[in-house]
């Protein structure tokens, strides 16, 4: 098995290779065709292809000379004003190589930049707009100051649909000569929650354990419990079997080593999916408020077991009240 990270090995190199995001790809291809584009802001959840789209755009614009015409920076590592005033300015001052009349600056995780750094970036964008275009990549567009947003065409990336994600994972598995069954794909999807990068990393980690990737192998690679075990705890609470629910909770906390926050996330997901029990809207809303309050108390430093046991007790009461209805 290759030691290369699969997320890099199978990263699309051109816009034609990008899975999903059809409307975005269509508009980006127009920029390539016209060799002209505004500043861009790519926003959306992690693992939805924002960085991949930016690099593919650079490949398609500049061909073999894309590296000479593209500056990549990660704002999480280089957040200060000094970077904006030195590296970007020095790079933006030089002319592009080739027949495209501008160079690219790709600034990943731009929503992690300080307010002062964003103001400095805004001035730099204005000063060098004649021969430089900026692609800002952010999980949250709302964290980018309005003066920058107004200077950019905003593209909002959506998580890859489940079917497309499965197709991509099966294709990668085929390229690597491994097998992956449907249960494994479901487990990977459950863990990644639409983040394709995380899904591919999980598949690679599982393949290091076995060339035949199953659900069991995936959870072994993750070092996580199956959602089924959390679901059983919730079902016990909803049925009023609190001692049984407590035993299952302790198993998750002390045998599997899950944190209270991890378990809360599982519970939140299960309540929303309603796989454990069907709930009317009012009951669902009440349970979600309880989950949120418990999460807050745990994050603030309260005892995990006490808070989670209190939540399970409240789940039992809410379920009983709903049944009487």
UniProtKB/Swiss-Prot annotation:
Keywords: ATP-binding, DNA replication, Nucleotide-binding. Pfam families: AAA (PF00004), RCF1-5-like_lid (PF21960), Rep_fac_C (PF08542). SMART domains: AAA. It comes from the Archaea. One of its GO terms (molecular function) is ATP hydrolysis activity. Disulfide bonds: none annotated. InterPro entries: AAA+_ATPase, ATPase_AAA_core, CbxX/CfxQ, DNA_pol3_clamp-load_cplx_C, DNA_Rep/Repair_Clamp_Loader, P-loop_NTPase, Rep_factor-C_ssu_arc, Rep_factorC_C. One of its GO terms (biological process) is DNA-templated DNA replication. GO terms for cellular component: DNA replication factor C complex. ATP binds at residues 44-51. PANTHER family: REPLICATION FACTOR C / DNA POLYMERASE III GAMMA-TAU SUBUNIT, REPLICATION FACTOR C SUBUNIT 4. Heteromultimer composed of small subunits (RfcS) and large subunits (RfcL). NCBIfam families: PRK00440.1. Belongs to the activator 1 small subunits family. RfcS subfamily. HAMAP family: RfcS. Part of the RFC clamp loader complex which loads the PCNA sliding clamp onto DNA. This is Replication factor C small subunit.
